[in-house]
């Protein structure tokens, strides 16, 4: 995974263009993301929250909240999905992992916030073009 950060989106886009040029790749050659799983769990039980929070050190899942579990391949696209979900709704990122074949994220919030975040993430992933994954 390679990330570029700047206050200027134009600088980030230019950096991406330069990296692709140096690697002799084109954006159109990227693998199109494929959703593997999208699940919404409402009214999380306190015991479920305790199990999920066992190894958390940051945001934690609060009992009674709604949780979104989203998985996508290739794994790196999960970061894009999380960013779009955060822009789409006021949610908490409980867990995100972009390693392996599938990227996974767990988000929490109110039911309406999670539905907005889900829609934002799924729509953004489905809007990306690319070649069919291998």
Which role does the model predict for each range below?
Residues 2-4, 87-128, 132:
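C-terminal binding/interaction regions
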Residues 63-69, 73, 101-106, 110:
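Glycine-rich phosphate/diphosphate-binding loops and the adjacent beta-loop-alpha structural elements
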């Amino acid at each position: 995974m390679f990330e570029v950060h700047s206050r200027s989106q134009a600088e980030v886009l230019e950096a991406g263009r330069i990296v692709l040029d140096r690697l002799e790749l084109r954006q159109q050659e990227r693998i199109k993301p494929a959703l593997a799983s999208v699940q919404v769990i409402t009214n999380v039980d306190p015991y479920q929250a305790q199990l999920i929070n066992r190894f958390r050190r940051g945001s934690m899942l609060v009992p009674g909240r709604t949780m979104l579990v989203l998985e996508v391949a290739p794994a790196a696209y999960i970061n894009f999905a999380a960013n779009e979900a955060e822009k789409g709704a006021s949610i908490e990122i409980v867990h995100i992992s972009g390693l392996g074949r599938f990227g996974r994220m767990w988000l929490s919030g109110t039911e309406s916030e999670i539905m907005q975040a889900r829609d934002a993430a799924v729509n953004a992933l489905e809007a990306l073009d690319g070649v069919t994954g291998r």
